[in-house]
């Protein structure tokens, strides 16, 4: 019985670590703004996104990398240009009832 509880605790810890990284990535006003712009405009390159964000390309690239590493956005390279878009599947999963069940079992 103790072994089962330890395994469940480790599994929950791993799940929390997974979500911690995702939520840290979006817990920033600038990154939320980037996500909102991508929601409204779809796929965009840094050169078009930077003026909308009123941010240098290097600073924008820093924020995009964090969102990419968390799999919140996707990147597609076409020639020398990189285009970014929201990863809808990941966002749907992140905002799904599955996560709700961890904290509010009655919703499941």
What is the meaning of each model-derived region?
Residues 1-26, 70-72, 92-94, 106-108:
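N-terminal leader segment of winged-helix/HTH proteins
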Residues 32-39:
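Pre-recognition alpha-helix immediately N-terminal to the DNA-recognition helix
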Residues 35, 64-65:
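Short, hydrophobic-biased segments on the C-terminal half of alpha helices
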Residues 48-50:
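A short acidic, leucine-rich amphipathic alpha-helix
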């Amino acid at each position: 019985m103790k072994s089962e509880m330890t395994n469940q605790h480790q599994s929950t810890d791993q799940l929390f670590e997974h979500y911690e990284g995702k939520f840290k990535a979006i817990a920033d006003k600038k990154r939320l703004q980037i996500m909102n712009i991508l929601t409204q405009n779809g796929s965009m390159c840094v050169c078009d996104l930077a003026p909308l964000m009123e941010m240098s390309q290097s600073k924008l690239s820093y924020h995009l990398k964090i969102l990419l590493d968390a799999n919140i956005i996707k990147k597609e390279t076409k020639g020398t240009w990189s285009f970014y878009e929201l990863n809808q599947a990941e966002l749907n999963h992140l905002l799904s009832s599955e996560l709700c069940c961890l904290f509010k079992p009655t919703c499941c």
